[in-house]
């Protein structure tokens, strides 16, 4: 049977449209808040509110999928995300935008859980890696195109919200023409998120997802603000964010092939080390293009390698629970990263954004080095 079946392709098409909308909002919301003269710590709190919504959405989507299936869960998630988008135009203010971004965060997390779980459950041990790679490519391509849109269109709030909302609703259309069936067989014992988080053999993968959340959450939430403080216009900010994300797209397949050949432990070490180098290079402000490129290539590919590490440690019937656990870990990191980095930037210097990213990456590198002789070195299937 073909890996890229009709339901899979339609699902990825819908994801591409939704990710476009997510990328546009994640870039422009911090800028809209800055234009409203909100302090940096409040900008960070709004970003954290979005990731708090991710946390909540991740927790209950597995139960929702079991009750109403993949298709209806996907429709509901998209409508919740659209509501969070429309709400931004109703009231402009710190507390109202915290609420709407929280709602949008719930919808986005539900979308990710539904899409990832559907791909994992429709695949086998022979093609699940290719499905995951296709998922990451679609996700990052949507993010890249979203950044380009920001650099080409008007960034005014009331100009952006109508077409972004339309794009979210258009993301529902592909799944109206297919039905995604859960081919996963019923397990004798249901798996829980907490059980997945406690697996010792998957701990490096879980920790990697947390670190990835800190790194990417901080970059998504605060990099536009950092660039704004450097005196850049919205179009330039969109361009540099596109450079960051395009590096992540280009790095997906090479990192997967390297992990397949040399093992995930070595690849994770190299990725984390390159994130540290990219952060240090950003502090020098001498060559932002190569610095952003290597930061994106390493930072954006950390999550799938860490995720593949953990998923290889569980049985087929545990994949949805493990997927939820990894998304939960990523979301916790995404919640903590922008909040802490925003406080550092507000009270001290914008450069502390990259110092924090380098510091947490160094801690994870120490974990990888310390566990070298204790943890098996699984080979990737991406």
Swiss-Prot record:
Coiled coil: none
InterPro entries according to UniProt: MFS, MFS_dom, MFS_trans_sf, MFS_YcaD, MFS_YcaD-like
Compartments in which it is found: Cell inner membrane
Alphabetical keyword list: Cell inner membrane, Cell membrane, Membrane, Transmembrane, Transmembrane helix, Transport
GO cellular component, one term: plasma membrane
Residues spanning the membrane: 8-28, 45-65, 75-95, 102-122, 131-151, 157-177, 204-224, 231-251, 270-290, 291-311, 325-345, 349-369
Taxonomic superkingdom: Bacteria
Membrane topology, from the record: Multi-pass membrane protein
Pfam families found in the cross-reference section: MFS_1
GO molecular function terms listed in the Swiss-Prot or TrEMBL record: transmembrane transporter activity
Record family assignment: Belongs to the major facilitator superfamily. YcaD (TC 2.A.1.26) family.
Family annotation (NCBIfam families): PRK03633.1
Protein name, per record: Uncharacterized MFS-type transporter YcaD
Organism: Salmonella enteritidis PT4 (strain P125109)
Underlying gene: ycaD
